Curated annotation (Swiss-Prot):
It comes from Mycoplasma pneumoniae (strain ATCC 29342 / M129 / Subtype 1). Its main location: membrane. InterPro entries: RDD. The keyword Transmembrane applies. It is found in: Cell membrane. One of its GO terms (cellular component) is plasma membrane. The chain crosses the membrane at residues 25-45, 56-76, 107-127, 149-169. Keywords: Cell membrane, Membrane, Transmembrane, Transmembrane helix. This is Uncharacterized protein MG243 homolog.
Amino acid sequence: MQVKVIDENSNTTAVLNCAKAKTRALAWLCDTVLLAILLAIIYGISSIFIKEQSSVFLIMTVSQAVLWLTYFVILPGLWKGKTLFRALLGLSLLIFKKRFWNLLVHELFLWVWYSVIFLALAIYFFVNRDDPKILQAFFDNQNSNLSWIFVKILLSVISVLQLVFVVYFCFSSQKQALQDLLSKSFMVQKAIKVKDCKSELKSTNTIKTHSDLPGDIDLEQLGD
């Protein structure tokens, strides 16, 4: 699949390929490893100064949510859909409108749901840190508490959905993955064709996007 991008400022048209699955996976893996290293550093520092496990768990959960939100939502929103390793590998996530919202939707089943659930659990464990049976109850498969059962079912459902996303992703090389379809976005690679489009702009209907995207995206020109 290709995306045609028209830049009115330079009067050029760029034809972009949807990214290959292996390139996307490599960028995501490298980005995740980078964040995991930062998270490990935070854990090491927290463990030195804080001995209470519930407090460390809360700090780690909040840190993970903030790091991932900053890196996978805020940074791409401000930097034309790029993260550090997307930029190094020539990738960019194009989003037509409601950028930050659709970036959040794009990451929803990758880490957002897990972050929200574990943040809620971390707060609950911290509030009830004086009760040693709370954490034990969560890992007790015989526990009939409806709240715990609901949380476990929710985590299981999200895990299954994640698996579906991963399987679909493996067969969506140079096409939109499920998270792209949900967020109305395209993960694209370097331009394969750039030409003057001054005359073409006069006869082509375009849809305005954010000014810091590569240009105006001609939806009628999208094709396989």
